[in-house]
Amino acid sequence: MIKNTNYFGIDISKNVFDVTGSDGKHYQFKNDISGFKKMLSLTNESSHCVMESTGVYHLRLAYYLYEKAIAVSVENPLSIKRFIQMRLTKIKTDKSDSQMIYEYAVNTSDELRLWKGQSPTQIACSQIISLTNLYTKQTTALKNKLQTEESMGSPCSQVIRSLKRSLKYLKNEIDKLEDSLLKLVKQDNQDLLTRVESIPGIGRRSSMLLIVLTGGFERFNKASELCSFAGLTPMIRQSGSSIRSRSRISKMGNRRLRKTLFMCSLSAKKYNKACKEIFDRIVAKGKSKKVALIAVCNKLLKQAFALAKSGLKYDRNYRSVLNNLN
């Protein structure tokens, strides 16, 4: 990073965003173009704005600053929370979130990754996945409604026909969207898609989702960063000198990625040799199958990351090579 960098910690919500700069002052602006211009007036060529990934709320400001040649980093909320918990033990609870993000930026400056936004193809892929998920939820709701209606003594034929038409329509739309997604992913990541898809337990649809949701795995330098992004890393709570409570996954990461991996784990625990060994070993220790499946999710993600970074295709006989890349 540039010497004498002027850092800004930015906490963004739907309507406003709070800012803390190196001068210690606090600002609050509207999360719209008028607020963006006021934020820009605080910056110069040595400024570096750091914010959390907040779904979609951060995107407009991040793109605005990026287009104005201001350095931007969009960090995993879990990374910031852990930093505060582990290293800033003297931090006071009355500090604003933007101030804590500022302190995170200053103390982890060498680890901050510059944000470059998404390409038009990546944006289109993300939008397709979002709409596909919406249609999938609607399909589930309609199927439940159809089942309820058909279980009635005298179901209305018009209602039944309407529900079936809607289900057919949604299925056709989902199929079209997934075909479009496949074409887009192949444009930039044909080789990566083939490699990720070679992992037992990860099918084509899941491979596409993994590639899109991780930005082709390019946003991560370590597998541990990727697992943290997915919210699969354990979180242990501790208060004072009290005994630590049972660890659990954070669930603060990308829910869509975590759900995709969990569905893959159900197959991987049977057909992926390394995953099966992990699953069987954990269950044999008396731990729950859910804990074992989470471990399988971690393993799958690490395998995908290793293949993405190494250029290798999955081969159970080369597990040692893959492990060295984890």
Predicted regions and their residues:
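Low-complexity, acidic/Ser/Thr- and charged residue-rich accessory regions of DNA metabolism proteins
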Residues: 241-242, 279-326
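Short hydrophobic alpha-helical segments that form membrane-spanning helices or hydrophobic packing faces
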Residues: 206-212, 293-294
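A residue-level signal for conserved active-site and pocket-lining positions in enzyme catalytic cores
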Residues: 101, 135, 261, 286, ...
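Helix-hairpin-helix/helix-loop-helix acidic hairpins
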Residues: 148-205, 214, 269-272
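Generic structural signal for well-ordered, non-transmembrane alpha-helical segments
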Residues: 133-136, 140, 165-175, 298
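Phosphate- and other anionic-substrate recognition elements at nucleic-acid/protein interfaces
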Residues: 1-158, 270
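Phosphate-backbone recognition surface of nucleic-acid-processing proteins
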Residues: 29, 34, 210-285, 289, ...
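Short helix-capping/linker segments at secondary-structure and domain boundaries
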Residues: 108-113, 142-143, 216-219, 268-274, ...
